[in-house]
Amino acid sequence: MAIIPDKQDSTVLERKEQKLKPPSMYKVVLLNDDFTPMEFVVMIVQEYFKKDRETATQIMLKVHREGRGVCGVYTRDIASTKVEQVVTHARQAGHPLQCVMEEA
């Protein structure tokens, strides 16, 4: 805010408009490995990224064939939480599945 004196010895406050930027977005990416079963990857994509079975299977095949697949794009906090949930679930199930986040 700027203080601007007017001609009658009183003060007028002038509010500067703040421009809000949308939050940075992050891709959540699954990485391929030679040990995690394909069906487990499909289940992870369905459970944590709310994809239907067909879409989850397409993402799993992309991970398998290309080495990586994007599961979704989220704000930083949500992406970070999803990465942590996926990695924790994979470790508890005994799988080395890797999940990372990258700026979109």
Swiss-Prot record:
InterPro entries per UniProt: ClpS, ClpS_core, Ribosomal_bL12_C/ClpS-like
Organism domain of life: Bacteria
Pfam (any one): ClpS
UniProt-listed GO biological process terms: protein catabolic process; proteolysis
Gene3D superfamilies: 3.30.1390.10
Xref: HAMAP family: ClpS (MF_00302)
Subunit structure: Binds to the N-terminal domain of the chaperone ClpA.
Family: Belongs to the ClpS family.
Biological role: Involved in the modulation of the specificity of the ClpAP-mediated ATP-dependent protein degradation.
Name used for this protein in its record: ATP-dependent Clp protease adapter protein ClpS
Species of the source: Burkholderia thailandensis (strain ATCC 700388 / DSM 13276 / CCUG 48851 / CIP 106301 / E264)
